[in-house]
Amino acid sequence: MTEGRIQSYRKKIYVIRQKLKAKKPKFLRYDSDKFYRLGRQEKWRRPYGRDNKTRLKVRGFPAIVSVGYRLPKKVRGFHPSGLRQVIVHNVNELVKVQNQKDNVIVTISSSVGFKKRLEILNKARELGLKVSNEGVVT
């Protein structure tokens, strides 16, 4: 594929992904709007109560998480820039993705320490790879 076609394909996938994500509801914990301690967590917890209306999928109550809301495989795993996101733990993994640098954006794993993070950042600059969490220092 030529560079122009790759860009248009990437943009098309990104637009499709945004449309699908806009339709998907924000899954909040049941009663998170009534209790501050539940709302601030913004974490989905499955309701198990016997008479819980969300669990029973009653109309007018929040949607429950299910497989049907998942995005298609072709549009899954993309960074907001439209590039495929790859998590890297060390310099060797960085070298493996160097031949895909036009289609990939690198994310340094959160478990990587400061010293190794600096090594990865220097190598990424050397190879001309884009890093999504470049400014994040743990």
Curated annotation (Swiss-Prot):
SUPFAM superfamilies xrefs: Ribosomal protein L32e
Record GO biological process: translation
Record flagged with keyword Ribosomal protein: yes
GO cellular component annotations of the record: cytosolic large ribosomal subunit
InterPro entries: Ribosomal_eL32, Ribosomal_eL32_arc, Ribosomal_eL32_CS, Ribosomal_eL32_sf
Pfam families the UniProt entry points to: Ribosomal_L32e
Gene Ontology terms for molecular function: structural constituent of ribosome
Top-level taxon: Archaea
Keyword Glycoprotein applies: no
Keywords: Ribonucleoprotein, Ribosomal protein
NCBIfam families assigned: PRK08562.1 (NF006332)
Family to which the UniProt record says this protein belongs: Belongs to the eukaryotic ribosomal protein eL32 family.
Name of this chain's protein: Large ribosomal subunit protein eL32
Organism: Saccharolobus solfataricus (strain ATCC 35092 / DSM 1617 / JCM 11322 / P2)
